[in-house]
Every structure is written in C-alpha cells, then in structure tokens.
C-alpha cells in the first residue's frame, strides 16, 4: 500500500486499533500494555506539513497526541513548546494536530490515546521524513599531466539513500558511485565531468560539474610552406596542440626571427597556431624556416620553406611514365 501524499491527512480509525492501553489522568499518561500490531507509516518530504488525525466513533472523555513519550496536546491543552505544532480539530468525532515545516527531528512514532466510557484505546502512526538528494561536497577543478591519475569525489546526502553517478560530458561515459578513479589519463579524457545524485523524492536530480584539465607537451599538427614571387606577400603557417598553450618561435637558418621593419616580416600568433607573414618578399627571404612550439612540458619543431616559383627545391618528384630516357635519368638522379 503506497504511503499518503505529503501533507495528506492520515485517518487513524481508533476503534479498529485495539493494539495497546493507556490511561490519561490529569494530563499524565502511563502505558500499560505493549502494542501487538505495527504502526501505520506516514511519509512526508522535509519542509512539508503533516496532519495527524484521530477519528473516533465512541464517546471520549479524554484524548491526547504524543510523540514517543512526550505529550504534544491533551485535549485543548498545549504541552509542547514547539511553535510548529498546533491543534487543528478537537471534536467528539475527530482530534487532529498539524506539524508545519517538518524536519528530520520530527521523524518517529506518534500515538493518539483516548479514554472512552468503557476503556482506554491507543493507535499509532510512524512519521517518515524524506529528504531530497543533494550534493554536499565535490572535488575542485583538477589539472594533471598526461599519464597521471585522477580521483574525483562527490558526496551526497538524502533520505532514502541517494544514488551517485559520474558522467563525462564529452563522450557520455558514466560510472556509478561517489568516487571516480581515472588511471593513466590521456588528453582525450579532459573536459567536464558531471556528478548527478537522485533518490526519487524530487523529480529533478541535483548535479554539479568538475573541470579536468590534462596537460601535455606540444605536438605540431600542420605546417604550410609557400611559393611566392619577388615583391609579393607570403605566409608560412605552423599549428600545434598543447596544454598549456604553446609559445611559438620562428627561426631561419638557426637565427631567431622577430617582427620588425628591418626583417620585413611579421609574426602573428593565435592560441594554437603561428604565422610568419611577409609583406614584400625579397631574395633574402627565400630559404628554410623552422617553427618551434614549446610549453613547460616539452617542445616540438617542424621545418618549412619559402620558395621562388619554378624552383625544383622541395617539389615532389614524379615517377617515370612514357617520358624520354633523359627525363627518366633526371628523375632517378633526383631520387638518389
């Protein structure tokens, strides 16, 4: 049988609950028999209101609501000092109290005890307080070098006991439990990880995210050489992936280059790439160039060329086809 909805009235039929005996005399209650049947359960969410109602089908001379052994109300007389507990109804047919803003401390056994003309009766209800799941502690953002280990922690509380799930937002990888262990982490595992907790009390789960940064040395992923005529503009490009981002340097024949009118070139660097710009190519600009990308974990270099149009340097040779013998010999010489 499902528990009543939060704030619902729990109808306790006293005449059908001959499970114990109590005597109220001038506000004093002493229990004289043990209860032979279990109490009904009444479930509410933390922060909701709970109405406890005792419906009576006999003439009653005395009636009281108790929490454990503490009297809350005896008839119209208030015994509790808790301002959240108040009397709702006290008639010959019904005796009801209201508990507002229910908290975990309100959970427990409640007893409606009343005296009829013939004998005393009691009936009981066990108030269960559910608490929505919420995250109380989660790991701070993590930065680790590639190949290292990462432990992410997510602590959640709630009643019933909540479930905790870790999820990597990039690829949807999931792991159950408060602790997520990642061994030998790789750059592809960097990104945001989300902790989600839920216990069914509220429709919306609680979630928080942690950013995991994986540091690794630069890897040059692309370079662009150029063939440009004298007097024209040219561009050499170098792209590199690295965390932290790489610092780029350009060299010509082992000489470090910098932007300036004397060199006739400009270095323009963005986050993952650097470009060497020539506004007006002169003969001294032709030759070999080296791009170097470095961060605190390492460095990587790649070479490229600025060539004169028509130059055979760095051009990919073609295999001999239906050509003259001289052409074939020239091709073989180039391969040697």
Curated annotation (Swiss-Prot):
Biological process, per Gene Ontology: motor behavior; neuromuscular process controlling balance
Pfam families: Ig_3 (PF13927), V-set (PF07686)
Residues the record marks as carrying a glycan: 41, 49, 67, 137, 288
Cystine pairs: 54-112, 154-195, 238-291
Limits of the Ig-like C2-type domain: 33-122, 132-213, 218-307
Chief place where the protein resides: secreted
UniProt keyword terms in alphabetical order: Disulfide bond, Glycoprotein, Immunoglobulin domain, Repeat, Secreted, Signal
Signal sequence range: 1-30
Cellular component, GO, one term: extracellular region
PROSITE patterns for the chain: IG_LIKE
Places the protein is found: Secreted
Family designation: Belongs to the immunoglobulin superfamily. IgLON family.
Protein name: IgLON family member 5
Organism: Mus musculus
Gene transcribed to yield this protein: Iglon5
